[in-house]
């Protein structure tokens, strides 16, 4: 009974926040740090603002390594993260995510790997997504991704694609889909595209998707998401079946956004 009351209150609050949107000051940050924003239809802009409001209400931000957490940081991260949600009309906003840790620059980390698993080898990182409800980002990578929104590299899109992938408890490149019938098409398309991608990378051929996607299916989904939102025309031309599958999943067509 208590669980039901808490859940109902959460749903009601999200609806209220979605309807209210964000302040003019926050929208100015949004427009400045998310190049596609001005090209979005009015309804999509309103939906994005609503998700940003929910995101900033529910998620905690923590500065690391001397990074100050300002509205610029919070809104910029939330805007890019919530771009992944605007077509899907989710009732929740990254439900398993609790905290976003932000470093000023790339950072060296060991212990936990990109999916929260133990990994003793320290490495320099731009960001991480943990299954324990944490995303880690470097602020200079966030701003770099915002400035160059057509290069196919965006740490926020990448790590939050991992969050979507991890919602079902597994980081395997297969996020929760709309219906059971969708999984067959997804598996056939993504597995075939992944195999084809591995062959091109092995032959050192140029690819629209970052070569890091060859690491495993989870990284392929994350890097394909970056290409889908940032290089949609190229991805559709080179990998039309993959583009259509991602378009069905995200319920948007970034080719229509001119910026």
Predicted regions mapped to residue ranges:
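Short acidic (Asp/Glu) and glycine-rich catalytic loops that position anionic groups and cofactors
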Residues: 9-10, 26-31, 56, 200-204, ...
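Metalloprotease/metallohydrolase-associated module, dominated by Zn2+-dependent proteases
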Residues: 78-94, 102-150, 170-259
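Amphipathic alpha-helical packing elements
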Residues: 18-58
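Active-site recognition of the HExxH zinc-binding catalytic motif
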Residues: 41, 151-167, 222
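Structural motif
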Residues: 42-43, 67-73, 211-219
């Amino acid at each position: 009974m208590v669980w039901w009351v808490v859940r109902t209150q959460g749903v009601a609050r999200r609806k209220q926040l979605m309807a209210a949107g964000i302040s003019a000051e926050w929208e100015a940050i949004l427009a400045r740090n998310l190049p596609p924003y001005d090209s979005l239809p009015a309804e999509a802009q309103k939906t994005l603002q609503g998700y940003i409001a929910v995101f900033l209400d529910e998620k905690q931000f923590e500065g690391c390594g001397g990074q100050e957490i300002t509205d610029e940081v919070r809104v910029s991260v939330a805007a890019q993260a919530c771009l992944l949600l605007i077509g899907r009309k989710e009732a929740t906003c990254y439900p398993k995510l609790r905290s976003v840790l932000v470093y000023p620059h790339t950072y060296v980390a060991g212990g936990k790997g990109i999916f929260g698993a133990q990994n003793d080898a320290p490495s320099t990182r731009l960001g991480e997504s943990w299954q324990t409800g944490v995303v880690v980002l470097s602020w200079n990578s966030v701003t770099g991704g915002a400035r160059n929104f057509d290069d196919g590299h965006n740490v926020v899109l990448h790590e939050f694609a991992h969050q979507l992938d991890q919602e079902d408890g597994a980081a395997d490149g297969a996020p929760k889909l709309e219906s059971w019938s969708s999984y067959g098409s997804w598996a056939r398309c993504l597995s075939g595209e992944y195999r084809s991608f591995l062959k091109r990378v092995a032959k050192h051929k140029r690819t629209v998707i970052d070569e890091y996607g060859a690491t495993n299916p989870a990284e392929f989904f994350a890097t394909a998401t970056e290409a889908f939102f940032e290089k949609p025309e190229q991805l559709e031309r080179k990998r039309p079946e993959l583009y259509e599958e991602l378009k069905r999943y995200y319920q948007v067509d970034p080719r229509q956004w001119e910026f």
